[in-house]
Regions:
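Thiamine diphosphate
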Residues: 1-169, 173, 308, ...
């Protein structure tokens, strides 16, 4: 058993290295992914070891990067595309929505598009405009895409491998402020399904559901609530499309209460879909309305204000208290 403690950034690097090493059809493309190793060094050393034909520095043109990846996928390759920052994905949105997500259905299933689009996302790093956004709901809304986000190093390692092996396009959101968080990774493990939610803390009074960067906050909230005698269950959703509603439903029907937490704005966020589905499925098990905690319906603020914008421990605990007060 090969168990090693590593950061999310290191786990992603090792997973990408494994993909390149085991499948000659895997390519990595993006701005500064080669010689520089990416702005977060996720692809560090890969061009040196696998060559410029497989780890490709591209022009600053996201639409062209994704369009090229689509063409390569049609020719039998498995491209992994890096979008340097979350706010830079929008020039490629047309290619992703009108081509990448739809070609399989358009061709009646006769072609596959095994493309992974990596997107470092979210705030918390004191960045400038266009560098701290959480646009995952825009992609989860699009049929034909898988949309996932790991919260820890083990999931980063294994979910990336599963994404690369998928014959469907995967939008892989990486929580950039968690890149340096470390945890154990078992590289010989047998991972669960890519879309499957995981219970990361057992509880009986209320369910917290989160993904990506907010899982850590929810675990901290559950630990704080425990000191006051409140038993909080925490689910790591892992996948925003498809969503593992069965696991969420089972937890909510045990606890009777649900709070959904994400960094993206609450308005039209993934939490709204989860709240609606659980209300439809488990209405008579609910002891309180489903509550949501997230960002505000406003452009992401300057770095000096982001701590006020980002949902943190206090806002999660406030929602927990409001739910338990019903």
């Amino acid at each position: 058993m090969a168990v090693e403690k590593m950061s999310i950034a290191k786990a992603l690097n090792e997973s990408l290295r494994h993909a390149l090493d085991t499948d000659p059809k895997v390519l990595i493309m993006g701005e500064d992914v080669g010689k520089l190793g990416g702005v977060f060094r996720i692809t560090d050393g890969l061009q040196k070891d696998f060559g410029e034909d497989r780890v490709i520095d591209t022009p600053l043109a996201e639409s062209g990067i994704v369009g090229t990846a689509i063409g390569l996928a049609l020719r039998g390759y498995r491209p992994i595309v890096e979008i340097q920052f979350d706010g830079f994905v929008f020039p490629a949105y047309d290619q992703i929505v009108t081509q990448l997500a739809k070609m399989h259905a358009r061709a009646l299933g006769k072609i596959k598009l095994p493309v992974v689009v990596r997107i470092p996302y979210g705030g918390g790093i004191g960045a400038v405009e266009h560098h701290s956004e959480s646009p995952e709901a825009l992609f989860a809304h699009v049929a034909g895409l898988k949309v996932v986000s790991p919260s820890n190093a083990s999931d980063a390692y294994w979910m990336m491998q599963q994404a690369v092996q998928s014959d469907d396009p995967v939008i892989f959101f990486e929580p950039k402020r968690r890149y340096w968080d470390k945890s154990e990774v078992d590289t010989d493990a047998i991972p669960g399904p890519l879309h499957k939610a995981v219970t990361v803390r057992e509880g009986s009074d209320l369910t917290l559901v989160a993904y990506g960067p907010m899982v850590k906050v929810c675990l901290e909230a559950a630990a704080a609530a425990q000191e006051e005698g409140k038993s909080i269950e925490v689910l790591d959703l892992r996948s925003m499309s498809p969503i593992d509603f069965d696991t969420v439903q089972a937890s909510v029907e045990k606890t009777g209460r649900l709070v959904v937490v994400h960094e993206a704005p609450v308005f039209y966020g993934s939490g709204a879909e989860i709240a609606a589905r659980i209300t439809e499925r488990s209405f008579y098990h609910l002891e309180a309305p489903v509550l949501r905690v997230g960002g505000y319906h406003a452009p992401y603020p300057p770095a000096r204000l982001e701590e006020e914008y980002l949902p943190g421990l206090d806002r999660v605990l406030d929602a927990v208290d409001r739910s338990l007060a019903y």
